[in-house]
C-alpha cells in the first residue's frame, strides 16, 4: 500500500489519528502488578466500592486507509500525551497527526515541530489562551500566533532540547450543532490549506473512535484468551494486526463497491469480512493454500451484503443505562467468532 504510493491522502498528506482508550483487563495478581488498577464505585450512595486492573491503549491509525501503524498498552494511570509521543517514532515526513482535546500541551506541539510532522489538535476550554478566547466567540476565526511554554514547563522543555517557541495557526469552525470548535495546526499556509477544509479534515478523526469500537465490540478485545500480562499484550497486538490484514484484503472489494452507481455509497460489511478472514486466515498466513484463488474467493465473500453509508444521517448520541449495557453485551452484541 505505502510502498507504491497508492493510498488515500488529504491535501497531499497521510492523515494519522493518535488516540488513547481504557481497556478492561483480567483481574489477576500478574496483571495488577504490570498495569495497575483504577478504583470504582456505584450503587445507591456509592455502597459498591472496589478497584480493578485497566490498561491505557494508544494507537496511531491511518483514518483514510483504515490501517493501524502502531499500538501500545500503557499502565492504567499512564499519561495519554506521553503514550502518544511514543507513536511519533512510527511517522514520517508527509504525515499529518490528528489529536483530540486531551493532547494540546505545549510539549506535544513542540515534539511535533522538532520531528518535522504536521499536526491538527483540537483546543479545549483549559488549553491555550488563544483557544479559550476563540471558544468564547472572541476575535477573528483565523489567528496565527507564537506559543511559548509557561513558566512551570520552561525548564523541562529546555532540558529536552525542544523549541522554546512554536508558530501555530488557530482555526475556529462552526459545528452543525451551533457550537464552536477551535483547532491548532502547524499548517500555516492559508492558500494551500484553506480554513474551510478543516471541519472535514478534523471530522476524519472519528475513524480512530470507530477503530476502537471494532477492537472492543466486533473483535471482543477485552475477552482475553489468557490471564497473564503477556497474554494481554499478545491478544492486543494480534487483534490490531487482524484489523490491518482485513483492511488490506478488502481493498479490491471496496474499490469495486466505490465504482457502483447506487443511491448511497456502499462499503464492505465488516461482520462478513472478519468472519471470512477468520475461516481462511490459517491457510493464508501459513501458506497452506494458493494465494491467488484464495484472495479471489475472499473478495467474492467481501462483496456480499454490503452496508450503506449515509453521511447525512446523524442520530442523537445516547448514554445507555448499566442495565441496557449488560443486556447488550450478554444477549445482543454480534461477535465475529
Please name every model-derived segment.
Residues 5-14, 18-337:
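Single, function-defining residue in the core of a domain
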Residues 1-2:
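Short, basic alpha-helical nucleic acid-contact segments in DNA-binding proteins
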